[in-house]
UniProtKB/Swiss-Prot annotation:
Disulfide bond annotation, renumbered to this chain: C64-C92, C66-C81, C71-C91
Lineage: Eukaryota, Metazoa, Chordata, Craniata, Vertebrata
Glycoprotein listed as a keyword: no
Gene for this chain: Defa9
Organism annotation: Mus musculus
Subcellular location: Secreted
UniProt name for this protein: Alpha-defensin 9
GO biological process: defense response to bacterium
């Protein structure tokens, strides 16, 4: 079931990326990334509250961010997240 949800989220992300044209304006390239809107920490929980084999120490230390433009170095895309009507990439390390 989790695999189906993850695959459908990836398909939706692919459609979203293809639907939105990439706009590279001078304003976007000159401004530095500012924390806040782009870098939002997300709490990630795996398994049930009583605990499961998925809740190992390495998974509890997982830190994820919702990012607009893609994952940073040492992060990998782990799905998508939504804020309002906008869809972001869920980048975890």
């Amino acid at each position: 079931m989790k695999t189906l949800v993850l695959l459908s989220a990836l398909v939706l992300l692919a459609f979203q990326v293809q639907a939105d044209p990439i706009q590279n304006t001078d304003e976007e390239t000159k401004t530095e990334e500012q924390p806040g809107e782009e870098d939002q920490a997300v709490s990630v929980s795996f398994g049930d509250p009583e605990g499961s084999s998925l809740q190992e120490e390495s998974l509890r230390d997982l830190v994820c961010y919702c990012r607009k433009r893609g994952c940073k170095r040492r992060e990998h895309m782990n799905g998508t997240c939504r804020k309002g009507h906008l869809l972001y990439m869920l980048c975890c390390r």
